[in-house]
């Protein structure tokens, strides 16, 4: 992509904010090819296979969203476009350190996006649309229109009204606090904005009538005060932060020949089936057949189970959560049927419970309480003498631990952020570069971490090393780093 040498003043300001405040690039689980593939299937689209997808991210920053995806999707290809040369260089250094060959970052302005980039199965623009000018918004949708594969999907996130009306009041307060303060650095402006915000909030809390009338504002203000400085600087002090109503975004899509609600090519729209969104059709055979094709991951915990009115459905979800939260509908139905039999309920009660189960699953698929996949991320149990950690994952963690954590988070197989990747993780992963006996690994752990501590007895050192081993094998399973020679699923 050709480098832009005539960047606008607002872009210069944005880059100055990035440099002064820093920025940590996040992974986002709802942007992965596996999730977008499933979302397309949910509404009847024959989306490209996630395993071999070609993915473009616009506004990729350091690449924290797609680098982690590239780690877990070795046959897919990822390209990120980012305006900041500094972020591209640092992100590409992390890619190099991680020894990844299926992801790259390119410096450039999307206004100069080159046609030679080709087509992509999935296009991501997370945290981008609301922070750019109207001209760039049009260009973003033009890029998607021209470069999205015929059956591909684009993911575009944006700030929406009416929710952002309250948050916008906080932004305006931040901007007001820094009026005529051009001499301050952006870090100083964030501090000043937070200070003024705290003073305003404290004054409101002194008066019961004001506190009651401004409860939404106080909630938004409290949320912002607790955020990191870089977040406050980017969300509330950048020159562009342009929320819109959902219908306004849809109208913008329509102007670029996209379908409303799901960003796909008009040629693919004929296959879209919106029955899944109609509560009256949730228990029809076509919708049940679609739901039965997914593997699910529950995101809520047992404390939230009271939201289910049907006791059998509540018991089913409780059992699924206790079993790890991953399930398909055959497993869920078997648990529900067992709960029905254990309760000695009448046969007339079973079908209503099944209907309630499907309704609950679909509702939480839409609301985000349950993730769903056609291609479920690989997660294997650790087996002594058979399991190991492939170099692909170890190199990624090494790149994060040895400097990359300043700019991005690590991520697990679902692309959820890992905020606590450590040298201990790296040590364990390097020890398990191939299948080894438990005793061999524990001996190495003891030598590396505990043998220098002369205050501990040998017995105590052995116990600590074994506890470390047990904890880390479970952690590696949970993160999706474990592979086994026996299963042949080596990455």
Q: Which residue ranges define each predicted feature?
A:
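A short glycine-rich, Lys/Arg-flanked "PGG" loop and its adjoining helix->strand segment in the class I
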Residues: 138-150
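Conserved alpha-helix/loop element of class I SAM-dependent methyltransferases that forms part
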Residues: 20, 24-52
